[in-house]
A protein has these predicted regions:
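A short beta-loop-alpha structural element at the N-terminal edge
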Residues: 5-17
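Conserved GNAT-fold acetyl-CoA-binding loop/helix
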Residues: 18-43
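A short helix-loop-beta-strand connector motif used in the catalytic cores of GNAT acetyltransferases and
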Residues: 43-55, 82
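Conserved beta-strand in the GNAT
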Residues: 55, 61-69
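A short, internal acetyl-CoA/4′-phosphopantetheine-binding micro-motif in the GNAT/acyltransferase core
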Residues: 86-93
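Conserved acetyl-CoA-binding loop-helix of GNAT-fold acetyltransferases
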Residues: 94-107, 134
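Conserved GNAT acetyl-CoA-binding A-motif
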Residues: 110-120
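Conserved beta-strand-loop-alpha-helix junction that forms the acyl-donor binding cleft
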Residues: 119-128, 147-151
């Protein structure tokens, strides 16, 4: 029997997911931007069902998680799966936890008829980039991510 188990998250996982998110934000040097709360996670993942998560355990110990949502490709005419965050605690890395989460997400994408499975990675995270190449992922160098947030988002929404 494998030491790794992966399951869908449940509302009682919200605090643990928030811990993972904060650990990830610290690793990415983005702690100041992390304003999520466990209540927000419970609302958007389990009440509104705007996103989903999987929890990874190693020999029963909390090891990591993946948070994802569905988007849509107009060109493919099919949904896609977008991985927002994946985090594995340092003590559990290099044991196949991340690969197990990716495999579970790929299976979910295939089962749901998704035409693609995408995510973003910080350009300085070379270990993650190497790992993703090993999975068969390819960079989308011709695309540049764009984001509206804060006052810019509010200003555009107020336009008449």
């Amino acid at each position: 029997m494998s030491a790794l188990s992966i399951r869908d998250a449940v509302p009682d996982d919200a605090e643990l997911m928030l811990d993972y998110i904060r650990e990830l934000a610290e690793f990415e040097h983005l702690s100041a931007e992390c304003v999520a709360t466990a209540a927000m996670l419970r609302r958007y993942l389990f009440e509104d069902k705007r996103a989903h998560a999987m929890m990874a355990e190693w020999n029963g110990a909390p090891a990591g998680f993946a948070l994802y949502f569905y988007n849509f490709s107009t060109f493919l005419g099919r949904p896609g799966l977008y991985l927002e965050d994946l985090f594995v605690r340092p003590a559990f890395r290099r044991n196949g936890v991340a690969r197990g989460l990716f495999r579970a997400l790929a299976r979910k994408a295939v089962a749901e008829g998704c035409g693609r499975f995408e995510w973003s990675v910080l350009d300085w995270n070379e270990n993650a980039i190497r790992f993703y190449r090993g999975l068969g992922a390819v960079p989308l160098d011709e695309w540049t991510a764009q984001r509206l947030t804060g006052e810019a988002l509010q200003r555009l929404a107020r336009e008449t």
